């Protein structure tokens, strides 16, 4: 046995089909032919090597690791890949839609009224895109409770200060002057804290020596005042939770937690480090009602004297100047060098995080590393704060009396609900929330900065359903009956999913072209066998999608006023067949015409019209019949009965496709890896290829306009003079020419 397996010295280099060398032990062996009759002749010791090259040798498919169960001859592998069930292609075609404007909202509500009764391709695709958008769109909580808030775990490194604790008197108490440059915050308790901070700044500019002695009492008074205000604000928030009516935003800036902020001055420059810590009751800061993550903001001064014309001080970080001029070490927060060298806010990319030492929320003595998103520091309006501002122009502004107000829409002096947005449905509210954070969209409220010191806060000018504001679930769950009970009664009837909030017209923008952020982008994302992908892309995206704007589906010209009539101008080459859209499969399909000759026997049947003759056929016959159907039809047939489901299931390997579902497996050591959880077999949604399109045998749109209820003819019998003809008779009496009469009189 070993002699047959081992390579002989002669056989290693012999490639002749007519080798005449006699077999000798250890030197050569006999010539044999391929057992699969591929025509190859070789020495018997090379049989295993030939099996690696034989074209007739049966091997597993190249996609066996992706779920293909077939084994076939090696020369059939390339041909099999075109129809391999594991050779799946994902369609990445994209299209875009604009949200419905406020002026067109009424007309789109009338268009969505009879969507279940009348099958319209453009409306079906638009509603499908809207359902996909709402299923993936998560509405942020506007009224978050402390019990519902789940704080994200973060690693904290406790750092004890070895220096004796001294009150923070190294400079001025920092004020959050730039946080609203990226995100506006609306709370009630912030205005009083800001006033207290401004008083400290005012007193510091007048007499820097008196600041050290008076800051102890001021900090204690601020703590007592903040505790009192937070208790009152908590009662107000509890009352707001009970009220499920209309909700409006209140302008303001959250400066809570200013006692925990730190500032260091060195060589006349100031470094402000602001921390948006949560309030005392455990809830996070609110931005126009939305919860915000903690972020840190730094302002660097470049050799600027913060105190105007006063003498330049030599206060260093961590030093405190006493009344006699001596300095003592302080336990104030040390700003790391990596934070001081931050690039300008305009150059920061999105989602740029950095670990920064900041005081702990529970104990100010401890320092912990907090993860800060530096991308949040960018201004939404495109004009970010300078990271090295000059405070010379603020030298006299501290002496000007200032007043902070929390305003609402009562002083706008406009009619109540001027745009007719009272009681908007959940779909409109969800899209409005999604566009509110977009600079290109129409925000619910906005803030504008005139300079570093003056900020104009936007306020919410209309009410929104409480179901949107008081929940933190997906929009699809919000639109359920349980969520609608908390909202206005009219929101549940009609169903919010039937009200179209997206434009019917598709906008095709290439990936490399910039898009408006208020435009929604949709991806096909359907899976097909490799041989089905070309026909899907040509028929669905090239023919149907391109013809929905008036060629494939032609709407009445008066659709803007509410007419829902439409007609199919094009049909497949087979006369009578039509394009349909299945809401459950989320795909288009071709419905062939049924000949009247085939319908007559069923009418004359004794058993009635509902008799099922197809199920009485043998299983093999049903398999043969189902083999002629496309994937879209097989998906429909599998939903008819258990028998038809078994028939379609027997065709999965030859007509279906296999998809891998991955799952994350965790090991006892703590690490994890992704492994194949299961292999799912199903049919694709591809329909038979349509090579030619023809005009359907239908009436003209002009015939519909004759009977259209919206085509109301308004006859103008009374003459209406032009502006220049108001004094025609008087001018003509004077004998002036007609040309001078027609000229406008100025």
Swiss-Prot record:
Residues 225-241 have a biased composition (Basic and acidic residues). It holds the Pfam family F-box_4. A zinc finger (TRAF-type) spans 49-110. Residues 222-241, 247-266 are annotated as: Disordered. Pathway: Protein modification; protein ubiquitination. Keywords: Metal-binding, Phosphoprotein, Ubl conjugation, Ubl conjugation pathway, Zinc, Zinc-finger. Residues 256-266 have a biased composition (Polar residues). One of its GO terms (molecular function) is ubiquitin protein ligase activity. Transmembrane segments: none annotated. The modification Phosphoserine is found at residue 383. One of its GO terms (biological process) is gene expression. Auto-ubiquitinated. May be neddylated. Neddylation may be required for E3 ligase activity, since it was observed only after purification with o-phenanthroline. SUPFAM superfamilies: F-box domain (SSF81383), TRAF domain-like (SSF49599). Residues 611-659 form the F-box domain. PANTHER family: F-BOX ONLY PROTEIN 30, PROTEIN CBG16327. Part of a SCF (SKP1-cullin-F-box) protein ligase complex. Interacts with SKP1, CUL1 and RBX1/ROC1. Substrate-recognition component of the SCF (SKP1-CUL1-F-box protein)-type E3 ubiquitin ligase complex. Required for muscle atrophy following denervation. This is F-box only protein 30. It comes from Mus musculus.
């Amino acid at each position: 046995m070993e002699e047959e397996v081992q390579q002989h010295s002669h056989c290693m280099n012999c490639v002749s089909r007519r080798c005449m060398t006699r077999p000798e032990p250890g030197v050569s062996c006999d010539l044999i032919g391929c057992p699969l009759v591929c025509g190859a002749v070789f020495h018997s010791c090379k049989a295993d090597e030939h099996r690696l090259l034989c074209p007739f040798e049966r091997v597993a498919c190249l996609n066996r690791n992706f779920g293909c169960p077939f084994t076939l001859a090696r020369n059939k592998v390339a041909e099999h890949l075109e129809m391999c069930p594991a050779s799946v292609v994902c369609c990445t075609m994209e299209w875009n839609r604009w949200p419905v404007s406020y002026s067109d909202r009424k007309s789109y509500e009338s268009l969505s009224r009879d969507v279940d009764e009348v099958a319209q391709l453009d409306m079906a695709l638009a509603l499908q895109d809207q359902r996909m958008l709402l299923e993936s769109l998560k509405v942020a909580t506007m009224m978050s409770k402390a019990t519902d808030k789940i704080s994200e775990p973060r690693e904290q490194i406790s750092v004890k200060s070895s220096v004796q604790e001294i009150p923070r008197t190294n400079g001025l108490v920092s004020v959050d002057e730039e946080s609203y440059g990226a995100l506006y915050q609306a709370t009630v308790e912030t205005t009083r804290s800001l006033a207290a901070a401004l008083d400290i700044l005012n007193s510091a500019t007048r007499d820097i020596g008196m600041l050290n002695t008076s800051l102890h009492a001021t900090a204690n008074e601020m703590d007592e005042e903040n505790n009192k205000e937070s208790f009152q604000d908590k009662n107000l928030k509890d009352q707001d939770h009970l009220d499920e009516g209309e909700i409006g935003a209140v302008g303001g800036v959250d400066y809570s937690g200013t006692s925990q902020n730190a500032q260091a001055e060195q060589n006349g420059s100031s470094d402000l480090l602001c921390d948006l810590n949560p309030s005392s009751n455990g809830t996070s800061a609110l931005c126009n009602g939305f919860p915000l993550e903690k972020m840190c903001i730094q302002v660097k001064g470049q050799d600027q004297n913060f105190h105007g014309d006063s003498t330049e001080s030599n206060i260093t970080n961590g030093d405190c100047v006493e009344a006699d001029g001596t300095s003592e070490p302080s336990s104030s927060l040390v700003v790391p060098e990596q934070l001081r060298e931050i690039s300008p806010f305009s150059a920061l990319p999105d989602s740029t995080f950095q670990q920064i030492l900041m005081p702990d929320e529970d104990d100010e003595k401890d320092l912990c590393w907090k993860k800060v998103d530096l991308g949040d520091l960018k201004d939404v309006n495109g004009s970010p704060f300078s990271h090295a501002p000059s405070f010379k122009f603020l030298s006299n502004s501290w002496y000007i009396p200032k007043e902070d107000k929390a305003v609402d829409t009562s002083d706008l002096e406009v009619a109540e609900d001027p745009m007719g947005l009272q009681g908007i449905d959940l779909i409109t509210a969800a899209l409005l929330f999604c566009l509110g954070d977009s600079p290109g969209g129409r925000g619910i409220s906005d803030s504008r900065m005139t300079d570093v010191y003056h900020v104009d806060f936007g306020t919410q000018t209309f009410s929104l359903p409480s179901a949107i504001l008081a929940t933190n679930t997906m929009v699809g769950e919000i639109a359920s009956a349980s969520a609608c009970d908390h909202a206005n009664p009219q929101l549940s009837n009609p169903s919010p999913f039937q009200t179209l909030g997206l434009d019917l017209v598709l906008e095709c923008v290439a990936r490399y072209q910039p898009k408006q952020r208020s435009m929604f982008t949709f991806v096909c994302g359907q899976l097909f066998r490799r041989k089905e992908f070309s026909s899907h892309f040509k028929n669905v995206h090239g023919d149907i999608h391109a013809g929905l704007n008036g060629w494939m589906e032609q709407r009445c010209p008066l659709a803007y006023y509410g007419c829902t009539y439409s007609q199919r101008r094009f049909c497949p080459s087979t006369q009578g067949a039509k394009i349909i859209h299945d809401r459950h499969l989320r795909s288009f399909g071709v419905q062939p015409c049924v000949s009247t000759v085939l319908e007559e026997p069923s009418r004359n049947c004794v058993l009635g019209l509902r008799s099922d003759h197809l199920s009485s056929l043998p299983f093999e016959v049903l398999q043969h019949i189902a083999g002629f159907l496309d994937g879209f039809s097989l998906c429909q047939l599998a939903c008819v009965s258990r028998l038809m489901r078994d028939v379609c299931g027997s065709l999965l390997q030859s007509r279906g496709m296999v998809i891998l579902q991955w799952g994350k497996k965790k090991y006892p050591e703590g690490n994890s890896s992704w492994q194949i959880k299961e292999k799912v077999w199903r049919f694709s949604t591809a329909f038979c290829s349509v090579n030619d399109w023809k005009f359907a045998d239908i009436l003209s749109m002009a015939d519909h306009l004759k009977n259209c209820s919206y085509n109301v003819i308004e006859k103008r019998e009374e003459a209406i003079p032009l502006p220049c003809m108001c004094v025609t008779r008087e001018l003509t009496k004077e004998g002036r020419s007609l040309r001078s009469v027609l000229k406008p009189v100025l």
